Amino acid sequence: MKFIDFPTPKGLTVTVNTDQVCQIFHDHSLTDAPALLDFASGEPQGVTDSVADAGKRLGIPLAELDGFSPTGSQIGTVLVVPAQVTFVRETEPGRPDAGSLIHLGNGRTRAVTQSRKDAVDRIMAAAAKDPDA
């Protein structure tokens, strides 16, 4: 299991579990041009024209994309392929000590942690207990 960090346009950092699949990220001010990211490789796979276009490129109908949009979030909307995407995001810019552990496998589970390291440790511990989780 490997985690990578990437900055967002609003100055936050998102830490992603690269064992998981694909995610479409866009800032609220750029809803017509989300970035399509493939976290299996950890490299951006290109910018799409829209969320629907991103789903089309992934071969997934828009209706089957799971969504998560934290209230008041500064990082915008995250749309994920419904297949366990686990990531950690800072709750405030420049505050990596204030992280949230968010598991988007069901689009709902969310737990606030003490830090991004703490969140990563929790993910690793959960994976060790249940490799299929």
Regions found by a protein language model. Give the residues of each.
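Eukaryotic intrinsically disordered, low-complexity regulatory linkers and tails enriched in Ser/Thr/Pro
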Residues: M1-A133
